[in-house]
Amino acid sequence: MERYQQLFDRLASNKEGAFVPFVTLGDPNPALSLQIIDTLVEAGADALELGIPFSDPLADGPTIQSAALRAFASGVTPTQCFEMLAAIRQKHPSMPIGLLMYANLVFHKGIDAFYQRCAEVGVDSVLIADVPYEESAPFRAAAIRHGIAPIFICPPNADDDLLREISSHGRGYTYLLSRAGVTGTESRAQLPLHHLVNKLREYHAAPPLQGFGISEPAQVRDALQAGAAGAISGSAIVKIIEQNHTQPAEMLTRLATFVSEMKAATRA
């Protein structure tokens, strides 16, 4: 959890926001997936948000669903994903690493065992996309027990009670939804979110990172101007993988360009 605090402190002192890319572990195959993650870090990613492939990803649009299918086609398993996470942590010791996933994968070997394994491989945070705050108690208790930050989604229509609960129980960062619906770049991020950001700050929430529909530098700047601490981009990155995975060198070059341009927008 401390890695997020250290990151946000460093960015604040540099007057920068955070740029956080999302990719699915094992997409398009384990070896290339690790190269992709190294490329994201080298191009300027401030933290990583990583998915474990899941067969029924309710919160995801077609782009990220396709990423899971590519990973499955290459034989990726949850066990292998944790081995990859350990390798990523070893290579990038100070980088905050978050998982964005679904409850079935947490239940598979038991909630406590899941968070224990996260701690062993150096994961900093876990966001479970299909567990609403009201059902989160056993997950967040296990997370805290093992030193993992429980991440909560703040939807655009959050009422005051939910904002207080998220602020009280969330750690690491707060996932601020640009809009309702599933992930994807087809629906652009909708702003402003000033009122939510102001309330989260008033209730001492973990710093908000805006996600869903973030695909261009102007949207990163808009998120920061609305008071967010940074932005998360998933579908736009996964689309680059989808369109270029048969040409790895071209894919890595395009990913590096995209991330460096998005990161540059956090300094504007």
Swiss-Prot record:
Coiled coil: none annotated. Pfam families: Trp_syntA. SUPFAM superfamilies: Ribulose-phoshate binding barrel. It catalyses: (1S,2R)-1-C-(indol-3-yl)glycerol 3-phosphate + L-serine = D-glyceraldehyde 3-phosphate + L-tryptophan + H2O. Keywords: Amino-acid biosynthesis, Aromatic amino acid biosynthesis, Lyase, Tryptophan biosynthesis. Its EC number is 4.2.1.20. GO terms for molecular function: tryptophan synthase activity. CDD domains: Tryptophan_synthase_alpha. It comes from the Bacteria. One of its GO terms (cellular component) is cytosol. Pathway: Amino-acid biosynthesis; L-tryptophan biosynthesis; L-tryptophan from chorismate: step 5/5. The keyword Lyase applies. The active site is at 49 (proton acceptor), 60 (proton acceptor). InterPro entries: Aldolase_TIM, RibuloseP-bd_barrel, Trp_synthase_alpha_AS, Trp_synthase_suA. The keyword Lyase applies. Belongs to the TrpA family. Tetramer of two alpha and two beta chains. The alpha subunit is responsible for the aldol cleavage of indoleglycerol phosphate to indole and glyceraldehyde 3-phosphate. HAMAP family: Trp_synth_alpha. NCBIfam families: trpA. This is Tryptophan synthase alpha chain. It comes from Serratia proteamaculans (strain 568). The gene is trpA.
